[in-house]
């Protein structure tokens, strides 16, 4: 049984990639996925590298209570610089571009048609507290799926 994606796509026009059980924030992953969808793979790589460097911020549209305002976001105010999730998305995009190149496509020029982050569980952990107690300190696990499609010249 292979890995299933949440969308059905034509393998003659698309390339796919997936991250499995990556330790990163699900909320950050959702916001990054929303922001890079519709961009070309090359544009998304440039954007994520700028996020990691602190030059561009990711708009936080749903999980934004207490999030500071950024002046580099068009049409929105709240944003952050999620470095760990951005690095994971860079790995995913590199994998997707390499898969596309292997299939005979021009990977950098393909458009991100579908990207989705799914919370799949937690890695249990504990944090020691006073008087011999311990509190749960779990780490979230996220699956991210990516579908790249060739640009239509219509």
From Swiss-Prot:
GO terms for cellular component: cytosolic large ribosomal subunit. The keyword DNA damage does not apply. GO terms for biological process: cytoplasmic translation. Keywords: Ribonucleoprotein, Ribosomal protein, RNA-binding, rRNA-binding. Coiled coil: none annotated. It comes from the Archaea. GO terms for molecular function: rRNA binding; structural constituent of ribosome. Pfam families: Ribosomal_L22 (PF00237). Gene3D superfamilies: Ribosomal protein L22/L17 (3.90.470.10). The keyword Protein biosynthesis does not apply. Part of the 50S ribosomal subunit. PANTHER family: 60S RIBOSOMAL PROTEIN L17. This protein binds specifically to 23S rRNA. It makes multiple contacts with different domains of the 23S rRNA in the assembled 50S subunit and ribosome. The globular domain of the protein is located near the polypeptide exit tunnel on the outside of the subunit, while an extended beta-hairpin is found that lines the wall of the exit tunnel in the center of the 70S ribosome. This is Large ribosomal subunit protein uL22. It comes from Natronomonas pharaonis (strain ATCC 35678 / DSM 2160 / CIP 103997 / JCM 8858 / NBRC 14720 / NCIMB 2260 / Gabara) (Halobacterium pharaonis).
């Amino acid at each position: 049984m292979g890995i299933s994606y949440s969308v059905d796509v034509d393998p003659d026009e698309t390339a796919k990639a997936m991250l499995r059980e990556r330790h990163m924030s699900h909320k950050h992953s959702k916001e990054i996925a929303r922001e890079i969808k519709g961009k070309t793979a090359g544009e998304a790589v440039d954007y994520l590298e700028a996020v990691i460097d602190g030059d561009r911020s990711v708009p936080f549209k749903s999980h934004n209570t207490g999030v500071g305002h950024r002046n580099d976001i068009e049409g929105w105010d709240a944003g952050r610089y999620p470095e760990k999730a951005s690095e994971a998305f860079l790995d995913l995009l590199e994998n997707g571009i390499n898969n596309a190149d292997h299939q005979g496509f021009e990977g950098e020029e393909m458009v991100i048609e579908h990207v989705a982050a799914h919370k799949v569980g937690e890695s249990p952990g504990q944090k020691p507290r006073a008087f011999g107690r311990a509190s749960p300190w779990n780490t979230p696990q996220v699956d991210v799926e990516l579908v790249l499609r060739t640009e239509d010249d219509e």
